[in-house]
A protein has these predicted regions:
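Hydrophobic/aromatic beta-strand patches that form the interior of the parallel beta-sheet core
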Residues: 152, 207-209, 244-246, 289, ...
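S-adenosyl-L-methionine
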Residues: 233-256
């Protein structure tokens, strides 16, 4: 078998689910990966699923790796060299791979795993054989199993042996879209952006809502919300994301005329909640996510959050409440 380059993707929490739920989440993860790569003009030539791993062949592995680090559900992604299961093929593959991977290293370690228990050599013995082969090719190196400069990983699976050394970390969590929709209240600040990102990581699709306060906010604030939305879009596999912009300047002006300044902030927030709930009903969202942090401002005291929550019939999700 000829050796070939392939992307190895690992995922974590998904594997803890029941077989039915896991299968559904894996399908969504694969669909999201294809969408993200396609949006960035990278063709997916083939995908193989095996034992908590995805093996992906693309038209541009180097750029694909960068994109995969922004796909929810991905724990890590690596460019791997695939060989056959013949020991000589694996040894030759590791020697070939090591010449580039260990070029600046003084010490190294081989980490072998054998999910394919039909393979006749144990993981420990295989690591020793491969380590000896590397030392013969590169005698200036030394083995250090505790604190090596570089590690080379070898996974023995039914479809072949996979050799890699770099793991690009992904966001983990669940695939985007497996938990339904939520309305995300976006202010342009860091709290609302992080809250939206965290709920996306748990598998929710977001429907961003921005309240345009007109002349009450600066042009810089409006530019900031655009930057935040652009950043969030990088993590969303959909081609288009509809942002609901609600003009609220006139309503705020009315509140200034009839509501005592002491209570104006909480009334304004209540209005935002009620509008968000109507949007949620319209789009079929099951909750509202906000960037509220307990005690940060007057409208975010426990008493006021309690009052606001009683106005709404659907769940209010506050991922950053304790930060």
């Amino acid at each position: 078998m000829m050796s070939e380059e392939v992307i190895l993707v690992s995922y974590g929490e998904i594997t803890l689910k029941s077989s039915r739920v896991r299968s559904r989440m894996e399908r969504v993860l694969i669909r999201n990966i294809i969408s993200q790569l396609k949006r960035n003009r990278i063709d997916v030539l083939k995908i193989h699923k095996e034992g908590g791993r995805l093996f992906i062949w693309t038209s541009n592995n180097k750029d694909a790796i960068k994109i995969l680090t922004k796909v929810f559900g991905v724990v890590s992604a690596s460019i791997a060299l695939k060989t056959g299961l013949n020991l000589n093929e694996i040894v030759n593959g590791v020697k070939k791979y090591s010449k580039e991977a260990l070029i600046n290293a003084k010490t190294f370690a081989i980490r072998a795993r054998r999910p394919n228990k039909d393979f006749p050599i144990t993981s420990i013995e295989l690591a020793r054989i491969l380590g000896d082969a590397v030392l013969k090719e590169m005698p200036n190196l030394k083995v250090d199993l505790n604190n090596p400069d570089k590690e080379i990983f070898v996974e023995i699976r039914r479809s072949g042996a996979y050799i890699y050394h770099e793991r690009k970390l992904g966001p983990k969590g669940f695939p985007y879209g497996v938990e339904g929709k939520v309305v995300a209240l976006m202010s342009g600040g860091i709290d609302s952006a992080v809250a939206a990102w965290m709920i996306m990581k748990r598998g929710c699709t977001i429907v961003p809502v921005y309240y345009d306060m007109g002349h009450y906010v600066s042009s810089i604030a409006k530019e900031r919300i655009m930057r935040v939305l652009k950043w969030l879009k990088e993590w969303i596999p959909s081609e288009k994301v509809k942002v609901h912009v609600v003009p609220l300047a006139y309503a705020h002006e009315l509140l200034r005329g009839i509501i005592n300044e002491r209570y104006r902030c909480i009334f304004c927030k209540a209005m935002m909640y009620l509008i968000a709930q109507e949007i949620a009903k319209e789009v079929g969202a099951k909750g509202i996510v906000t960037g509220e942090s307990l005690g940060q401002v007057a409208s975010q005291t426990l008493d006021n959050l309690y009052l606001l929550s009683r106005l709404i019939d659907i769940p209010i999700l506050r991922p950053v409440i304790g930060f």
